[in-house]
Amino acid sequence: MKDCVEVLKALADPNRLRVFWLLARIDERICVAEAMDVLGESHYNASRILKSLKQAGLVTAEREGKWVFYSLPAPLAGSFHAHLLKAIQAIPAENFSEEIKRCQLRLGMREHGECIVGADSDAWRNVSTQAQTKRKPAARKRHTEVV
């Protein structure tokens, strides 16, 4: 029962829930730099969020060179984790619309399926700024008459 309580505590935080929901939906691993950019959090906060999920057994970590990748562990059929994963996946996507957009942009920067861009890089700032500009409707100019 203690394990179940720890898992539910880990997901009671909105940022940890956002990361877990995204991992459950994208079915890919992410590195800390990608999590930082998607969440808009500092390296410290993103690492802490992922560490809490790992300690609760909700994600696994795999180091490859300078990158640490996080992904969901394979749940056992019928296990508490499998049921929890199904419940998390049932949360409507509109609750995470901004995170989904940012995640799609960030994962689109990968080369050969791997993260190659560090956190909060100029490349990320350019891509995310361009995407925000495209989404915002053009402001109408006010015409003022000088009499």
Predicted segments with their positions:
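N-terminal helix-turn-helix DNA-binding core of bacterial DNA-binding proteins
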Residues: 2-42, 64-76
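Alpha-helical residues within the helix-turn-helix
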Residues: 37, 54-55
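Short, hydrophobic-biased segments on the C-terminal half of alpha helices
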Residues: 50-51
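A short, conserved structural fragment
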Residues: 58-62
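Amphipathic alpha-helical dimerization/coiled-coil segments
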Residues: 77-147
